[in-house]
């Protein structure tokens, strides 16, 4: 399991530390299974973390009320935006592009990406992630203009049915595609990032392979031995 191997390689305390940097207020336990999502995290905490990715490494606190005025238009309350740089923009760009592969037909191999059921619904580029437990399903996705999360479960915390696993994915995809804007929806490539065509099975360069993004100097510069 790649997530767990990476978690153990980096040190179990690093996941907890990163959670705090991303404003996840729920304490993440420092054990091996935390990499698989065994810590229960609420929607606000999830949104806190993914907002930072959607905002290219800068965190903005999620809020419900933007402004309150009286009948004379005097401002009684107004939310104050305070952006905080949390992550390096270059690495966030790489991660955001990786999260577009969750619904990419090109990534079908020994198994299918987890969001293939919504691939045909999407008419723009989004970074999307989904998750599930015995008691709930969730899907979260974004571009540079919008972030939306959908959760489904039972009020009594009863187990959910496997046949309902696509519910949050479909609600998310059908709703997000109704939101239109004239603004550019995907991110500009930051300085210091380059693209390379690779064989995803080996990570080596392959002409007409899958395009992945790298920090300059780390891209593969050797030919995939399995290339045609």
Regions found by a protein language model. Give the residues of each.
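Active-site-adjacent helix/loop patches that line small-molecule binding or acyl-intermediate pockets
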Residues: 1-55, 98-101
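A penicillin-recognizing enzyme superfamily signal
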Residues: 42-48, 52-227
């Amino acid at each position: 399991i790649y997530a767990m191997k990476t978690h153990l390689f980096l040190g179990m305390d690093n996941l907890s530390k990163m959670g705090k940097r991303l404003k996840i207020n729920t304490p993440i336990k420092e054990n091996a299974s935390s990499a698989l999502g065994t810590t229960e995290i609420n929607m606000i905490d999830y949104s806190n973390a993914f907002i930072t990715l959607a905002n290219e490494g800068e965190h903005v606190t999620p809020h419900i009320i933007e402004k309150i005025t009286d009948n004379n238009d005097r401002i009684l309350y107004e939310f104050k935006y305070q952006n905080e740089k949390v992550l390096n923009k270059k690495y966030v760009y790489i991660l955001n592009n990786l999260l577009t592969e969750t619904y990419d037909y090109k990534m079908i191999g020994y198994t299918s990406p987890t969001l293939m059921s919504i691939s045909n619904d999407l008419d723009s580029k989004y970074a999307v992630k989904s998750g599930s437990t015995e008691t709930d399903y969730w899907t979260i996705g974004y571009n540079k203009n919008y972030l939306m999360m959908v959760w489904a479960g039972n009020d009594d915390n009863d187990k959910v049915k496997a046949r309902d696993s696509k519910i949050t994915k479909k609600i998310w995809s059908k709703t997000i595609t109704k939101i239109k804007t004239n603004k550019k929806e995907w991110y500009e490539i930051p300085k210091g990032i380059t693209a390379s065509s690779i064989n995803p099975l080996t990570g080596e360069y392959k002409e007409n392979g899958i395009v992945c993004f790298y920090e300059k100097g780390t891209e593969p510069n050797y030919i995939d031995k399995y290339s045609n």
